[in-house]
């Protein structure tokens, strides 16, 4: 069986579970379950701490896993990034107290930086020629400055609300941009059939999430103009209607552009324009 690690908690967990469910994999029915066998798909799911997933995959104990790009880099393991999964977008930033004189990267020299990602921060500071102490904490790093453990922090930022509520101010450029990724063990070949099937399914979910199915009727003489607006992946499906002066068009279009496309199609004569969500896909 293909052994797949998924986050058991945190911001990546629920989107990862949903994605696997939409890809047809069986999930746990009890939150206390740590391992789920899915014989129909020849996989085993292991619910692990997000911080540990890259370690297990890097050592070959687990074949593939879903984790954050930042967690992968910080792990320092041999696990390899296989594909981006389109959720969990975040940045990794420095933050200091609002009244702190620390306002730029150079000001970190000689300071204490609290973080869960000590390797990532250490490597970044060394790369920029800055000597500072990294203080490893397993969580809630935003409290470390107030408690006197550190002078500033480095942490994952999604909206920045938590930092602002803690009286912290973001400064300097992001250390890293991150999102959820599928990683694989160095012992698992990139063209392994089981990995190919998993990747194809996940890509199908991504495609379904980002696109919709659009149907509309168009006068025959306007078909070319309509196809220019909605060319689809390969080509739209065009079918004759009972009224020979009209044709029906079915095409996959980007979800983000639906309303603009509907406006453009209406302007060239399309009518009966409807949009349907996609559940799954293989493109």
Curated annotation (Swiss-Prot):
Top EC group: transferase
Chief location: cytoplasm
One GO term of the biological process aspect: L-histidine biosynthetic process
Regulation: Feedback inhibited by histidine.
UniProtKB keywords: Amino-acid biosynthesis, ATP-binding, Cytoplasm, Glycosyltransferase, Histidine biosynthesis, Magnesium, Metal-binding, Nucleotide-binding, Transferase
GO molecular function: ATP binding; ATP phosphoribosyltransferase activity; magnesium ion binding
Subcellular location: Cytoplasm
Cellular component GO terms held in the UniProt record: cytoplasm
Pathway as given in its UniProt record: Amino-acid biosynthesis; L-histidine biosynthesis; L-histidine from 5-phospho-alpha-D-ribose 1-diphosphate: step 1/9
Gene3D superfamilies from the UniProt entry: 3.30.70.120, Periplasmic binding protein-like II
Family in the record: Belongs to the ATP phosphoribosyltransferase family. Long subfamily.
Name of this protein: ATP phosphoribosyltransferase
Gene field: hisG
């Amino acid at each position: 069986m293909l052994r797949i690690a998924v986050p058991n908690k945190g911001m990546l967990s629920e989107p990862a579970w949903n994605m696997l469910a939409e890809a047809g994999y069986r999930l746990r029915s009890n939150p206390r379950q740590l391992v789920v066998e899915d014989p129909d798909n020849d996989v085993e799911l292991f619910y692990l701490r997000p911080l540990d997933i890259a370690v297990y995959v890097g050592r070959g104990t687990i074949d593939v896993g879903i984790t954050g790009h930042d967690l992968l880099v910080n792990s320092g393991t041999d696990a390899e990034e296989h594909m981006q999964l389109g959720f969990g977008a975040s940045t990794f930033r420095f933050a200091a107290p609002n009244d702190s004189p620390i306002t730029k990267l150079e000001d970190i020299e000689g300071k204490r930086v609290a973080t869960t990602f000590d390797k990532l921060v250490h490597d970044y500071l060394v790369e920029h020629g800055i000597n500072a102490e990294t203080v490893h904490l397993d969580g809630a790093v935003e409290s470390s400055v107030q408690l006197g453990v550190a002078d500033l922090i480095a942490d994952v930022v999604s909206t920045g609300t938590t930092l602002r509520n803690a009286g912290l101010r973001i400064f300097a450029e992001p250390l890293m941009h991150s999102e959820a990724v599928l990683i694989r063990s160095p012992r698992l070949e990139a063209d392994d059939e089981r990995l190919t099937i998993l990747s194809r399914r996940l890509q199908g979910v991504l495609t379904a999430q980002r696109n919709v199915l659009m149907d509309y009727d168009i006068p025959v003489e306007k078909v070319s103009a309509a196809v220019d607006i909605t060319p689809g992946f390969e080509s739209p499906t065009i079918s004759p209607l009972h009224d020979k002066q009209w044709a029906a068009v079915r095409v996959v279009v980007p979800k983000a552009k639906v309303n603009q496309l509907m406006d453009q199609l209406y302007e060239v004569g399309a009518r009966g324009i409807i949009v349907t969500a996609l559940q799954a896909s293989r493109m």
